[in-house]
From Swiss-Prot:
This is Phospholipase A1-II 2. GO terms for molecular function: phospholipase A1 activity. Residues 392-403 have a biased composition (Acidic residues). The keyword Hydrolase applies. It is found in: Cytoplasm. Keywords: Cytoplasm, Hydrolase, Lipid degradation, Lipid metabolism. It comes from Oryza sativa subsp. indica. Residues 381-403 are annotated as: Disordered. The keyword Lipid metabolism applies.
Length: 403
């Protein structure tokens, strides 16, 4: 993949790579999909925990503790925390039952990572990744967010000042741009946390060939769409130390199961950004990508798959099955089009589709929702009492300037 990275990241708008689906592109998409899955695996979703809404692991240990194929290829450099206005907060953010929790008004929403030396050698460049956490829930969350559109001019730079006033979903924009000066984790908006870190990494690696890849699933896909447009529109893909911003890193968004983010004006502004590409993976039976149904437009190049053709999955799967990220990755591994059958070109373990759901056909001896932390992170102490230990403190919680 190292010699083809520009092609795989959309330099030619993926012409000739989608039907049939290129095997290197399959592997590339699965790698990024696993990096999104890391946000689900590491998120503390237990309401009773005082750490609910936080990340379970330290940045230094993240890729070693989650299920990714290449844990040595990237290092997490910053965690992202997001809050939102009252109309959105209770619908998509988790609040711990314990009011002493640190994430009572915000949630961990992902991370920024950069390719290590090992990863840069394998990938052909120094790749900077922004991974946004989404939701594995099906239709109810996106249907709940029936909010009016809001102007996207603030994130589109000059492209947003052309008189067309492009608009995006107010709820997604709120998650991306809201801050809380009373929060130790969200004094900066998620937007500024990411842009500040991107700028730092672009300066740090100004003498190397770099790329910026923004990834997400479901709700995270909408945030990735906003973030990728923001980076390209406001020239965060250049180093402030390079004369005249002469070196511009390509920005690519890779999203799975994405709802629509903005209107036609936003779509047109997105497509005019010369350094920006987007590949949107859609599973045909998934209804989430059709929301909101009116007034919004699809963005980027679509890769359509249909996991109903897989012989490994339940024939009449649930709505959550069609939206499940692991099922999307299963589809990427084996999809050959409507009339070519289904065969796993990439040897991806079918047991993974039952990690957080009940998707695998009954003849396979794999328990449903088998990804459970040992004893749900309850640890027996020397005094014989059990206590919850589900969070490793991270320097990023307190120090915004850590390298």
């Amino acid at each position: 993949m190292a010699s083809r990275w520009r092609e795989l990241h959309g330099s030619g708008h993926w012409d000739g790579l989608l039907d049939p689906l290129d095997v290197d592109l399959r592997r590339c998409l699965i790698t990024y999909g696993e990096m999104i899955m890391a946000t689900y695996e590491a998120f503390i979703g237990e309401h009773r925990s005082p750490n609910a809404g936080m990340c379970r692991y330290r940045r230094a240990d993240l890729f070693r503790r989650v299920d990714v194929s290449h844990p040595g290829w990237y290092a997490a450099t910053r965690y992202i925390y997001a809050t939102a206005n009252a109309d959105v907060h209770g619908k998509v953010l988790l609040r711990p039952l314990c009011r002493e929790g640190r994430a009572t008004e915000c949630n961990w929403m992902g991370y920024v990572a950069v390719a290590t030396d090992e990863g840069a050698a394998a990938l052909g460049r120094r790749d900077i990744v922004v991974a946004w956490r989404g939701t594995q829930r099906a239709l109810e969350w996106v249907a709940d967010l029936k909010l009016a559109p809001a102007s996207a001019a603030g994130i589109l730079g000059p492209e947003g000042a052309d008189g067309t006033d492009p608009s995006v979903h107010r709820g997604y924009l709120s998650l991306y741009t809201s801050e809380d000066q009373c929060s130790e984790l969200n004094k900066q908006s998620a937007r500024m946390q990411v842009l500040t870190e991107i700028a730092r990494l672009m300066d740090k690696y100004k003498d190397e060939e770099t790329s910026i890849t923004v990834i997400g699933h479901s709700l995270g896909a909408t945030l990735a769409t906003l973030n990728a447009a923001d980076i390209a529109a406001n020239s965060y893909n250049t180093s402030s130390l390079s004369p005249s911003g002469e070196t511009r890193a390509p920005v690519t968004a890779v999203v799975f199961g994405s709802p629509r983010t903005g209107d036609r004006g936003f779509r047109d502004a997105f497509h005019r950004l010369r350094d920006l590409r987007m590949l949107r993976v859609r599973n045909r039976p998934d209804r989430i990508p059709h929301y909101p149904p009116v007034g919004y437009a699809d963005v980027g190049v679509e890769l359509l798959i249909d996991t109903r053709l897989s012989p490994f999955l339940r024939r009449h799967g649930s709505e959550s099955q069609s939206h499940d990220l692991e099922c999307h990755l299963h589809g990427v591994a084996g999809w050959h089009g409507d009339h070519r059958g289904f065969e796993l070109v990439v040897d991806r373990d079918v047991a993974l589709v039952n990690k957080f759901d009940d998707c695998l056909a009954d003849e396979y001896p794999v328990p449903v929702r088998w990804k459970v932390h040992h004893n749900k992170s309850m640890v027996k102490g020397p005094d014989g009492r059990w206590v919850l230990q589900d969070h490793e403190p991270d320097d990023d919680d307190d120090d915004d300037d850590d390298d």
